[in-house]
Amino acid sequence: MLPGGRPPGRQELRIYDMNEHTFFEWKRSERLTAVLALVFCLLGLGLQRLPGVGFSGKLSWGLALVCLVLLGLSRLSRRSRGWKLLLRIAQIGLAALVLGLSAVEVWVIRAGHRDESAQPADAVIVLGAGVNGTTPSVALQTRIDAAERYLKAHPDIPAVLSGGQGPGEDTSEARAMYDALTARGIDPERLILEERSANTRQNLKNSLPLLEKQGFDSYGGRLAVITNGFHMARVGLLWDLPTELVQVPAKLPWWLDANYYLRESFAIVNDMVLRPLLA
């Protein structure tokens, strides 16, 4: 009630609403959004200090920014219907984005958790990952370990080691795998180096002709693909031949696995949807 016992009018109520300056006078949803922004910001700072999970740190900062934008729109929505409409559009767009990315993430996880390493194959492709100078990264080391186990279990099949030399690498990914596998007793005659590829599409495209020279039937053979689980969905998406693929996933530590699975869903949406639209 206003002085004199008069109830506040609509304009006066609007002015009162906009004067809710303190945190505890905000709507409950606004307080929750502000707390989430702070949590995501602190989480991002913490994750950025850990090796190998940089994407999760950046994603946390991105989520903090989204929360701040939604908070700002929520506060401004009290001023006019235009701001309220913009808030609704942002909320609907965010919900659609989350649902779409969640669907992609479920598909990536399901593809990555199929382990067929006990099944035989006619040939092998080991996909490269980063090299720190001449030392294999954690991801590449796990692929080398998986390749060693599979090649020792199937001693009569050839393998292409696929991966070029990127920035900051003193040797190609293929050569790093070759050196490690031969040091562990794998016959070098079985190993074929493919050192030109810079991405997964090139890995597959450049490796197949090398296997065909060894007698591999790309239209009827069974091809074992060794890479990390998060990578398997992309391999299946890019592979367009009737060759039966045998998935041999290399195991990462759980915290790296979670980071790479998150990153992969965004990368697939970027490569398969956004990039073709913007090209």
Predicted regions and their residues:
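Perimembrane helix-loop junctions in membrane proteins
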Residues: 78, 108-115, 274-278
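Internal/C-terminal transmembrane anchor helices
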Residues: 85-107
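A structural signal for short, hydrophobic/glycine-enriched beta-strand patches
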Residues: 102-262
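Membrane-interface helix-boundary motifs at transmembrane edges
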Residues: 76-88
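A transmembrane-helix-recognition feature enriched in membrane-embedded lipid enzymes
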Residues: 258-277
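N-terminal amphipathic/basic-hydrophobic helices that include classical n-h-c signal peptides
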Residues: 1-18
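Membrane-embedded alpha-helical segments of integral membrane proteins
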Residues: 28-77
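Short juxtamembrane and helix-loop transition motifs at transmembrane-helix boundaries
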Residues: 20-26
